[in-house]
Protein backbone atom coordinates (compact mmCIF):
# COMPACT_ATOMS: atom_id res chain seq x y z
CA UNK A 1 0.00 0.00 0.00
CA UNK A 2 1.09 3.56 -0.65
CA UNK A 3 1.20 4.67 2.99
CA UNK A 4 3.25 1.66 4.05
CA UNK A 5 5.67 2.20 1.20
CA UNK A 6 5.83 5.89 2.04
CA UNK A 7 7.00 5.16 5.60
CA UNK A 8 9.56 2.67 4.37
CA UNK A 9 11.04 5.14 1.93
CA UNK A 10 11.46 7.80 4.61
CA UNK A 11 14.44 5.85 5.86
CA UNK A 12 16.05 5.98 2.43
CA UNK A 13 15.92 9.75 2.08
CA UNK A 14 13.69 12.20 0.28
CA UNK A 15 13.68 15.41 -1.72
CA UNK A 16 10.70 17.76 -1.63
CA UNK A 17 9.76 20.03 -4.54
CA UNK A 18 6.76 22.17 -5.51
CA UNK A 19 4.64 21.28 -8.53
CA UNK A 20 2.03 23.22 -10.53
CA UNK A 21 -1.34 22.93 -8.83
CA UNK A 22 -4.99 23.98 -8.99
CA UNK A 23 -5.33 27.71 -8.11
CA UNK A 24 -5.32 28.15 -4.33
CA UNK A 25 -3.98 24.66 -3.62
CA UNK A 26 -0.41 23.63 -2.95
CA UNK A 27 1.12 20.53 -4.50
CA UNK A 28 4.35 19.13 -3.08
CA UNK A 29 6.20 16.25 -4.66
CA UNK A 30 8.42 14.09 -2.48
CA UNK A 31 10.92 11.84 -4.22
CA UNK A 32 12.66 8.91 -2.56
CA UNK A 33 15.31 6.32 -3.15
CA UNK A 34 18.34 6.19 -5.38
CA UNK A 35 18.11 8.52 -8.38
CA UNK A 36 14.71 9.76 -7.14
CA UNK A 37 13.18 6.50 -8.28
CA UNK A 38 9.86 6.94 -6.46
CA UNK A 39 7.66 9.99 -5.86
CA UNK A 40 4.49 10.90 -3.97
CA UNK A 41 2.40 14.05 -4.25
CA UNK A 42 0.67 15.75 -1.34
CA UNK A 43 -2.08 18.22 -2.28
CA UNK A 44 -3.20 20.85 0.24
CA UNK A 45 -6.52 22.50 -0.62
CA UNK A 46 -7.47 23.43 2.96
CA UNK A 47 -9.15 26.65 4.13
CA UNK A 48 -10.31 27.73 0.66
CA UNK A 49 -14.09 27.43 0.98
CA UNK A 50 -16.78 25.03 -0.29
CA UNK A 51 -16.37 26.15 -3.91
CA UNK A 52 -13.08 24.22 -4.09
CA UNK A 53 -14.80 20.85 -4.66
CA UNK A 54 -14.68 18.95 -6.85
CA UNK A 55 -11.02 19.85 -7.34
CA UNK A 56 -8.78 18.29 -10.02
CA UNK A 57 -5.57 16.83 -8.62
CA UNK A 58 -2.42 15.32 -10.18
CA UNK A 59 -2.61 11.73 -11.36
CA UNK A 60 -0.16 10.39 -8.76
CA UNK A 61 -1.58 12.16 -5.69
CA UNK A 62 -1.10 10.18 -2.47
CA UNK A 63 -2.61 12.58 0.08
CA UNK A 64 -5.35 15.21 -0.25
CA UNK A 65 -6.15 17.80 2.43
CA UNK A 66 -9.67 19.27 2.16
CA UNK A 67 -9.93 20.36 5.79
CA UNK A 68 -11.49 23.64 6.99
CA UNK A 69 -13.47 24.30 3.81
CA UNK A 70 -16.97 24.57 5.32
CA UNK A 71 -18.08 21.55 3.28
CA UNK A 72 -21.62 20.45 4.15
CA UNK A 73 -21.81 17.18 2.24
CA UNK A 74 -19.55 14.68 0.51
CA UNK A 75 -20.67 12.36 -2.26
CA UNK A 76 -19.10 10.22 -4.95
CA UNK A 77 -18.87 13.07 -7.46
CA UNK A 78 -16.83 15.23 -5.06
CA UNK A 79 -14.16 12.53 -4.81
CA UNK A 80 -14.03 11.46 -8.45
CA UNK A 81 -11.43 11.96 -11.13
CA UNK A 82 -8.16 10.48 -12.39
CA UNK A 83 -6.05 11.67 -9.43
CA UNK A 84 -8.37 10.16 -6.82
CA UNK A 85 -7.69 6.57 -7.79
CA UNK A 86 -4.26 6.62 -6.10
CA UNK A 87 -5.27 8.43 -2.89
CA UNK A 88 -3.90 6.78 0.25
CA UNK A 89 -4.79 9.61 2.65
CA UNK A 90 -7.79 11.98 2.77
CA UNK A 91 -8.36 14.77 5.31
CA UNK A 92 -11.94 16.10 5.61
CA UNK A 93 -11.63 17.39 9.17
CA UNK A 94 -12.95 20.73 10.45
CA UNK A 95 -15.79 21.00 7.96
CA UNK A 96 -19.57 21.25 8.39
CA UNK A 97 -20.43 17.71 7.36
CA UNK A 98 -23.68 16.42 8.84
CA UNK A 99 -24.10 13.44 6.53
CA UNK A 100 -22.12 11.34 4.07
CA UNK A 101 -23.52 9.47 1.10
CA UNK A 102 -23.06 5.67 1.36
CA UNK A 103 -21.09 5.62 -1.91
CA UNK A 104 -18.91 8.64 -1.09
CA UNK A 105 -15.66 6.64 -0.86
CA UNK A 106 -16.55 3.84 -3.27
CA UNK A 107 -13.94 4.84 -5.88
CA UNK A 108 -11.05 5.27 -3.43
CA UNK A 109 -9.63 1.78 -3.86
CA UNK A 110 -6.29 2.53 -2.19
CA UNK A 111 -7.41 4.77 0.68
CA UNK A 112 -5.72 3.81 3.96
CA UNK A 113 -6.18 6.89 6.17
CA UNK A 114 -9.39 8.93 6.51
CA UNK A 115 -9.88 11.92 8.82
CA UNK A 116 -13.49 13.01 9.39
CA UNK A 117 -12.93 14.58 12.80
CA UNK A 118 -14.43 17.88 13.95
CA UNK A 119 -17.61 17.76 11.88
CA UNK A 120 -21.29 17.38 12.74
CA UNK A 121 -21.89 13.79 11.65
CA UNK A 122 -24.87 12.24 13.41
CA UNK A 123 -24.93 8.84 11.68
CA UNK A 124 -22.79 6.48 9.60
CA UNK A 125 -24.26 4.70 6.56
CA UNK A 126 -23.94 0.93 6.57
CA UNK A 127 -20.96 -0.48 4.66
CA UNK A 128 -19.64 3.00 3.90
CA UNK A 129 -15.99 1.91 4.13
CA UNK A 130 -16.19 -1.48 2.41
CA UNK A 131 -14.54 -0.36 -0.85
CA UNK A 132 -11.29 0.92 0.71
CA UNK A 133 -8.40 -0.86 2.49
CA UNK A 134 -8.55 1.55 5.43
CA UNK A 135 -6.21 1.13 8.38
CA UNK A 136 -6.98 4.41 10.19
CA UNK A 137 -10.38 6.14 10.60
CA UNK A 138 -10.75 9.29 12.70
CA UNK A 139 -14.35 10.21 13.57
CA UNK A 140 -13.64 12.09 16.78
CA UNK A 141 -15.47 15.29 17.71
CA UNK A 142 -18.72 14.62 15.86
CA UNK A 143 -22.32 14.14 17.03
CA UNK A 144 -22.66 10.38 16.65
CA UNK A 145 -25.12 8.81 19.12
CA UNK A 146 -25.50 5.20 18.01
CA UNK A 147 -22.94 3.37 15.89
CA UNK A 148 -22.96 -0.08 14.33
CA UNK A 149 -19.71 -2.00 14.51
CA UNK A 150 -20.50 -3.35 11.04
CA UNK A 151 -20.02 0.14 9.60
CA UNK A 152 -16.26 -0.38 9.95
CA UNK A 153 -15.98 -3.44 7.75
CA UNK A 154 -13.35 -2.47 5.18
CA UNK A 155 -11.61 -3.96 2.17
CA UNK A 156 -8.52 -4.45 4.31
CA UNK A 157 -7.98 -8.20 3.85
CA UNK A 158 -7.28 -8.68 7.56
CA UNK A 159 -5.07 -5.63 8.15
CA UNK A 160 -5.26 -3.95 11.56
CA UNK A 161 -7.76 -1.09 11.78
CA UNK A 162 -7.51 1.87 14.16
CA UNK A 163 -10.78 3.71 14.88
CA UNK A 164 -11.14 6.95 16.87
CA UNK A 165 -14.71 7.67 18.03
CA UNK A 166 -13.77 9.89 20.96
CA UNK A 167 -15.67 13.05 21.89
CA UNK A 168 -19.03 12.07 20.43
CA UNK A 169 -22.44 11.48 22.05
CA UNK A 170 -22.38 7.70 21.67
CA UNK A 171 -24.40 5.74 24.21
CA UNK A 172 -24.74 2.50 22.29
CA UNK A 173 -22.69 0.31 19.96
CA UNK A 174 -24.56 -2.23 17.87
CA UNK A 175 -22.58 -5.51 17.68
CA UNK A 176 -21.73 -7.19 14.40
CA UNK A 177 -24.55 -9.62 13.48
CA UNK A 178 -23.63 -13.28 13.75
CA UNK A 179 -25.06 -14.03 10.29
CA UNK A 180 -23.85 -10.91 8.52
CA UNK A 181 -22.88 -11.26 4.86
CA UNK A 182 -19.65 -9.32 5.43
CA UNK A 183 -16.91 -10.33 7.90
CA UNK A 184 -16.51 -8.57 11.23
CA UNK A 185 -14.24 -5.51 11.16
CA UNK A 186 -10.58 -6.06 12.04
CA UNK A 187 -10.50 -3.28 14.65
CA UNK A 188 -7.40 -3.60 16.84
CA UNK A 189 -7.40 -0.09 18.34
CA UNK A 190 -10.65 1.57 19.46
CA UNK A 191 -10.93 4.95 21.17
CA UNK A 192 -14.36 5.44 22.77
CA UNK A 193 -13.28 8.09 25.27
CA UNK A 194 -15.54 10.97 26.29
CA UNK A 195 -18.84 9.56 25.12
CA UNK A 196 -21.98 8.61 27.08
CA UNK A 197 -21.56 4.92 27.82
CA UNK A 198 -22.99 3.84 31.18
CA UNK A 199 -21.78 0.28 30.73
CA UNK A 200 -18.93 -1.34 28.84
CA UNK A 201 -20.26 -1.97 25.30
CA UNK A 202 -20.36 -5.45 23.81
CA UNK A 203 -17.16 -5.72 21.78
CA UNK A 204 -16.77 -9.48 21.76
CA UNK A 205 -15.13 -11.14 18.77
CA UNK A 206 -13.28 -7.96 17.75
CA UNK A 207 -9.49 -8.53 17.62
CA UNK A 208 -8.92 -5.59 19.97
CA UNK A 209 -5.46 -4.85 21.34
CA UNK A 210 -6.16 -1.30 22.60
CA UNK A 211 -9.37 0.09 24.12
CA UNK A 212 -10.04 3.47 25.74
CA UNK A 213 -13.25 4.29 27.63
CA UNK A 214 -11.86 7.38 29.35
CA UNK A 215 -14.31 10.05 30.46
CA UNK A 216 -17.49 7.96 30.16
CA UNK A 217 -20.16 7.85 32.93
CA UNK A 218 -19.49 4.19 33.76
CA UNK A 219 -20.93 3.18 37.12
CA UNK A 220 -19.46 -0.29 37.49
CA UNK A 221 -17.46 -2.97 35.71
CA UNK A 222 -19.31 -6.28 35.57
CA UNK A 223 -17.22 -9.47 35.74
CA UNK A 224 -18.22 -10.38 32.17
CA UNK A 225 -17.89 -6.84 30.77
CA UNK A 226 -14.82 -7.72 28.70
CA UNK A 227 -15.92 -11.16 27.56
CA UNK A 228 -14.45 -12.14 24.21
CA UNK A 229 -11.54 -9.67 24.45
CA UNK A 230 -8.81 -12.07 25.53
CA UNK A 231 -6.33 -10.45 23.13
CA UNK A 232 -6.59 -6.98 24.69
CA UNK A 233 -3.20 -5.69 25.91
CA UNK A 234 -3.96 -2.02 26.77
CA UNK A 235 -7.09 -0.82 28.61
CA UNK A 236 -7.70 2.78 29.68
CA UNK A 237 -10.49 3.66 32.15
CA UNK A 238 -9.21 7.08 33.20
CA UNK A 239 -11.26 10.07 34.39
CA UNK A 240 -14.58 8.26 34.44
CA UNK A 241 -17.52 10.50 35.25
CA UNK A 242 -19.27 8.13 37.64
CA UNK A 243 -18.36 6.64 41.01
CA UNK A 244 -16.56 3.61 39.68
CA UNK A 245 -16.91 0.39 41.65
CA UNK A 246 -14.43 -2.36 40.85
CA UNK A 247 -15.72 -5.76 41.98
CA UNK A 248 -13.46 -8.76 42.62
CA UNK A 249 -12.32 -10.51 39.43
CA UNK A 250 -13.60 -7.60 37.33
CA UNK A 251 -10.86 -8.12 34.73
CA UNK A 252 -10.84 -11.90 34.66
CA UNK A 253 -11.67 -12.00 30.94
CA UNK A 254 -8.43 -10.16 30.06
CA UNK A 255 -5.60 -12.64 30.66
CA UNK A 256 -3.31 -10.91 28.13
CA UNK A 257 -3.66 -7.38 29.51
CA UNK A 258 -0.29 -5.62 29.95
CA UNK A 259 -1.27 -1.98 30.64
CA UNK A 260 -4.21 -0.80 32.78
CA UNK A 261 -4.95 2.91 33.32
CA UNK A 262 -7.34 3.77 36.18
CA UNK A 263 -5.97 7.27 36.77
CA UNK A 264 -8.07 10.34 37.52
CA UNK A 265 -10.78 8.48 39.46
CA UNK A 266 -10.77 10.12 42.92
CA UNK A 267 -13.97 8.33 44.00
CA UNK A 268 -12.83 4.91 42.92
CA UNK A 269 -14.30 2.23 45.20
CA UNK A 270 -12.06 -0.67 46.08
CA UNK A 271 -12.92 -4.30 46.67
CA UNK A 272 -9.46 -5.59 47.52
CA UNK A 273 -6.55 -6.81 45.47
CA UNK A 274 -8.76 -9.59 44.07
CA UNK A 275 -9.92 -6.95 41.58
CA UNK A 276 -6.76 -7.77 39.63
CA UNK A 277 -7.11 -11.52 39.87
CA UNK A 278 -6.29 -13.19 36.58
CA UNK A 279 -4.06 -10.40 35.25
CA UNK A 280 -0.94 -12.53 35.26
CA UNK A 281 0.72 -10.56 32.43
CA UNK A 282 -0.03 -7.01 33.64
CA UNK A 283 3.15 -4.90 33.66
CA UNK A 284 1.94 -1.29 34.10
CA UNK A 285 -0.79 -0.05 36.43
CA UNK A 286 -1.77 3.63 36.72
CA UNK A 287 -3.72 4.55 39.87
CA UNK A 288 -2.60 8.19 39.99
CA UNK A 289 -5.22 10.74 40.94
CA UNK A 290 -7.21 8.14 42.88
CA UNK A 291 -7.71 7.56 46.58
CA UNK A 292 -6.00 4.16 46.50
CA UNK A 293 -3.05 5.03 48.74
CA UNK A 294 -1.41 3.11 50.32
CA UNK A 295 -1.42 0.25 47.86
CA UNK A 296 -3.40 -2.80 48.88
CA UNK A 297 -1.48 -5.63 50.45
CA UNK A 298 -0.77 -8.70 48.38
CA UNK A 299 -0.87 -6.65 45.14
CA UNK A 300 2.23 -8.30 43.70
CA UNK A 301 0.87 -11.72 44.52
CA UNK A 302 -2.04 -11.11 42.15
CA UNK A 303 0.15 -9.35 39.57
CA UNK A 304 3.32 -11.44 39.26
CA UNK A 305 4.53 -9.61 36.10
CA UNK A 306 3.95 -6.08 37.45
CA UNK A 307 6.86 -3.72 36.79
CA UNK A 308 5.53 -0.24 37.66
CA UNK A 309 2.62 1.42 39.47
CA UNK A 310 1.67 5.10 39.56
CA UNK A 311 -0.23 6.23 42.67
CA UNK A 312 -1.34 9.43 44.38
CA UNK A 313 0.19 12.59 42.99
CA UNK A 314 3.46 12.08 41.10
CA UNK A 315 4.41 8.90 42.96
CA UNK A 316 5.96 6.15 40.88
CA UNK A 317 6.57 2.65 42.22
CA UNK A 318 8.84 0.16 40.50
CA UNK A 319 9.36 -3.52 41.06
CA UNK A 320 12.62 -4.54 42.74
CA UNK A 321 13.93 -7.99 43.55
CA UNK A 322 16.05 -8.17 46.69
CA UNK A 323 18.40 -11.08 47.00
CA UNK A 324 19.45 -10.29 50.56
CA UNK A 325 22.90 -10.08 52.15
CA UNK A 326 23.49 -13.81 52.08
CA UNK A 327 23.04 -16.51 49.52
CA UNK A 328 19.51 -17.79 49.33
CA UNK A 329 18.79 -21.28 50.53
CA UNK A 330 17.86 -23.80 47.84
CA UNK A 331 14.16 -23.58 47.10
CA UNK A 332 13.70 -20.12 48.62
CA UNK A 333 12.40 -17.16 46.62
CA UNK A 334 13.87 -13.65 46.43
CA UNK A 335 11.95 -10.88 48.18
CA UNK A 336 9.96 -8.76 45.72
CA UNK A 337 9.26 -5.16 46.69
CA UNK A 338 7.73 -2.03 45.23
CA UNK A 339 10.10 0.91 45.62
CA UNK A 340 8.10 4.16 45.52
CA UNK A 341 9.44 7.66 44.97
CA UNK A 342 8.11 11.11 44.13
CA UNK A 343 8.74 11.75 40.45
CA UNK A 344 9.25 15.45 41.19
CA UNK A 345 11.90 14.89 43.83
CA UNK A 346 15.23 13.15 43.75
CA UNK A 347 14.82 11.63 47.19
CA UNK A 348 13.07 8.29 47.04
CA UNK A 349 10.82 6.95 49.72
CA UNK A 350 11.47 3.68 51.45
CA UNK A 351 10.36 0.52 49.71
CA UNK A 352 6.93 -0.89 50.37
CA UNK A 353 7.28 -4.64 50.68
CA UNK A 354 4.20 -6.45 49.48
From Swiss-Prot:
Protein name: Tsukushi
One Pfam family of this chain: LRR_8
Keyword NADP: no
The LRR repeat ranges on this chain: 60-81, 86-107, 110-131, 133-154, 160-180, 186-207, 208-228, 231-253, 256-277, 281-302
Tissue: Expressed in macrophages in inflamed wounds with wound expression starting 2 days post-wounding (dpw) (at protein level). At 7 dpw, expressed from epidermis and extracellular matrix in the wound edge to neoepidermis and granulation tissue and in panniculus carnosus under the granulation tissue (at protein level). After fibrosis, disappears in the dermal area at 11 dpw (at protein level). Expressed in the hair follicle during morphogenesis and the hair cycle (at protein level).
Primary location: secreted
InterPro entries tied to this protein: Dev_Immune_Receptor, Leu-rich_rpt, Leu-rich_rpt_typical-subtyp, LRR_dom_sf
GO terms for biological process, alphabetical: anterior commissure morphogenesis; camera-type eye development; cholesterol efflux; cholesterol homeostasis; cholesterol metabolic process; ciliary body morphogenesis; corpus callosum morphogenesis; energy homeostasis
One GO cellular component term noted in the UniProt record for this chain: extracellular space
UniProt-recorded Gene Ontology molecular function terms: transforming growth factor beta binding
